[in-house]
Design a protein with these regions (language model features):
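Conserved recognition-core residues within compact binding domains
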Residues: 1-76, 83-164
Length: 165
């Protein structure tokens, strides 16, 4: 088998497998990931382009190798099944920051069963409010940001009174 297919040019000392495993060619062993404060796997590996040790998340490495992701294209790497530990290429996709935020909003549910964000559309821009209080996700046409904030407050009052429809 030709293992060169698993190498990224900037990290030639490592095999990056489609499963998300990272293998050190020099040390002849799989690297053990560490975890960042948000629960993502990460590795500290040498980047030959900068000649420095770089800490990088596993899903970003896999996306760089198999999805042609670079940090300059404005896209973010998303876990399709929302499992931060499933870094297999078939579970990763590239999304715009807005798409990623909206996916998060509509997929995450608070302990009370309600969504965790609210979105507002003002002209052609969409504003997303992450909620720490119980509010539902709605899409509103707003005249301006102040109008959106007022509508957000109206929704909150209705929820508190138990009259949301």
């Amino acid at each position: 088998m030709d293992f060169s297919q698993f190498i990224l040019p900037e990290f030639p000392e490592y095999y990056i497998y489609p499963t998300g495993q990272i293998y050190s060619i020099r040390n002849k062993k799989y690297l053990k990931p560490r975890f960042d404060k948000d629960g993502y796997e990460r590795f500290s590996i040498k980047n030959v382009l900068t000649n420095k040790i770089q800490t990088i998340k596993t899903h970003q490495l896999v996306a760089m190798k198999y999805l042609n992701h670079n940090n300059t294209n404005g896209l973010v790497v998303d876990h399709i099944d929302n499992n931060k530990l499933n870094n297999a290429v078939h579970n990763l996709q590239l999304l715009s920051p807005l798409q990623n935020t909206l996916k998060y909003c509509y997929s995450k549910v608070q302990k009370n069963g309600l969504p965790s964000c609210i979105t507002y559309k003002i002209k052609k821009k969409i504003y997303v409010f992450k909620l720490k209080t119980p509010e539902c996700v709605y899409n509103y046409e707003c005249k301006n940001l102040l109008d959106c904030i007022e509508k957000k407050n109206e929704i909150f009052k209705k929820i508190v009174k138990g009259k949301l429809n």
